[in-house]
Structure formats: structure tokens, C-alpha cells
Amino acid sequence: MDTLSQMLTKIRNAQMARHRWVLVPASRMNWNVAQVLREEGLIAQVQPADLHLRIQLKPKRIQRIWRVSKPGLRIYSSYKNMPKVLGMLIISTSKGVMTHQKAKQMQVGGEILCGVY
């Protein structure tokens, strides 16, 4: 299991167990995805801690979070063919990690990492 999948699973499980904090593996991709979630108001804060990231969750903000592009099957999309979803998609583009709405505004496509609502 890759670190992004681990992070999403830990957030999902902590949210269901009503935990306030969760420790996830530290990586640059996890940090960038966590920053996007924080900017969108889905998590309260992210703090680096040794080899982990400490994420403070907001109660009942994330209803569902899932991995789209996996190591065995990468999913890419241009900004013109971005799928319509309930909630938002997090995209890794050449301009950085961002939501699918921001990618459409900037007219860049990329790898669809995960979805959240």
C-alpha cells in the first residue's frame, strides 16, 4: 500500500471513530494533499512530527474519501475532460497539487489522486 492510500485510510478510520488527531506517514505528496484539504476546510491543521504528519480533523467534515489513481492503474485527465463528482477531486498537475475546480480555472490536467466529499 502506498503512503497516500495509507493516509486516506487513516483519515477515514479516524473520522469514523471520531478521533480528533491522526498520525499519517510523512511524504511530500501526503503533505501537499493535506494542505489542499486544509485550504478547503476539511481538516483543521497539519503539523510535521518526526517521520509522520499530525493531522487535526474537523468533526463530520469528510463524509467519504477515496483513492482514484492507484500505483497499478494511473488515472489522468485533461482539464477539458475532468469528471463531474459530488464534492471535489484532488489532482496532481505540473503546477502542483490542487482541486479539480482550480485545475479547470488554470487550464491544466494531471493525475487524479483522490476524491472527497
UniProtKB/Swiss-Prot annotation:
GO terms for cellular component: chloroplast; ribonucleoprotein complex; ribosome. GO terms for molecular function: rRNA binding; structural constituent of ribosome. Keywords: Chloroplast, Plastid, Ribonucleoprotein, Ribosomal protein, RNA-binding, rRNA-binding. It is found in: Plastid, Chloroplast. PROSITE patterns: RIBOSOMAL_S8. InterPro entries: Ribosomal_uS8, Ribosomal_uS8_CS, Ribosomal_uS8_sf. The keyword Plastid applies. Disulfide bonds: none annotated. It comes from the Eukaryota. One of the primary rRNA binding proteins, it binds directly to 16S rRNA central domain where it helps coordinate assembly of the platform of the 30S subunit. Belongs to the universal ribosomal protein uS8 family. Part of the 30S ribosomal subunit. HAMAP family: Ribosomal_uS8_B. This is Small ribosomal subunit protein uS8c. The gene is rps8.
